[in-house]
Swiss-Prot record:
Belongs to the YciB family. Pfam families: IspA. The chain crosses the membrane at residues 20-40, 57-77, 86-106, 123-143, 156-176, 187-207. It comes from the Bacteria. This is Inner membrane-spanning protein YciB. The keyword Hydrolase does not apply. It is found in: Cell inner membrane. GO terms for cellular component: plasma membrane. Keywords: Cell inner membrane, Cell membrane, Membrane, Transmembrane, Transmembrane helix. Its main location: membrane. Plays a role in cell envelope biogenesis, maintenance of cell envelope integrity and membrane homeostasis.
Length: 220
């Protein structure tokens, strides 16, 4: 039996079953925690000066981690309150944020929060590529997609996203291991998002080529 928290494959749901978050709010819920993380790290010393109690958390990166965790929980709660479902990707990412964020604060070691993107991207990349190995295109379960594709389209798109996730994991490892914390935080917020947007736009020809019409979708 499928757990109600998890979203099913979008192709299996009718429009009446879907309770979607408005696009702008959805974008805000996805970007909000990252922006909190960036500005808390960039302005951490100022925040600590203004609110001395925050100094007990530690350096700006630790304050940013704590606020990132709080913002992530709030974003998931808002999404749940509006749709009564949690898409797989934000849910898994949120769980990893809480686990690795807690380790970061407990051990006072920012390595854990820096490895979070590596873990999440490797996990999703492994799931997608592993699914293809067993003949399953699992992209519909990872993303809350609104489009319908034929089987070949799902396979190709799943392969591309699986490889892209692995690419992001490798890039994150290179950046956090070779550059300063501030550079890594900036790249995480202002580098990964543009790269992802460009990659997504590059998939539009494939999506258009393999999109199903309403008649084809009903017949399938």
């Amino acid at each position: 039996m499928e757990h109600p928290v998890f979203e099913r494959d979008p192709s299996e749901k009718s429009e009446t079953e879907r309770r979607e978050v408005p696009p702008l709010l959805k974008l805000a819920l996805e970007l909000g925690p990252l922006l909190v993380f960036f500005f808390a790290n960039a302005r951490g010393e100022m925040l600590i000066e203004r609110f001395p109690i925050l100094g007990s958390i530690g350096a700006p990166i630790f304050l940013a981690t704590a606020l990132f965790m709080a913002a992530t929980v709030i974003a998931l709660a808002i999404s749940w309150s509006m749709t009564r479902t949690l898409p797989i990707m934000p849910l898994v990412s949120g769980i990893v944020v809480l686990v690795f964020g807690a380790l970061t604060l407990w051990l006072h070691n920012d390595t854990f929060i820096k490895m979070k993107p590596t873990i999440v991207n490797t996990l999703f990349g492994g799931i997608l590529l592993g699914g293809l190995f067993f003949g399953k295109s699992l992209l519909g379960y990872v993303f809350d997609s609104a489009f319908r594709l034929d089987a070949e389209g799902w396979r190709k798109l799943t392969l591309r996203w699986g490889l892209f996730f692995i690419f992001l994991a490798i890039v994150n490892e290179i950046v956090w291991r070779n550059f300063s914390t501030d550079t890594w935080v900036s790249f995480k917020v202002w580098g990964i998002m543009p790269i992802t947007i460009v990659f997504t736009l590059l998939q539009m020809p494939l999506i258009q080529k393999h999109s199903l019409t309403d008649e084809e979708n009903t017949a399938s």
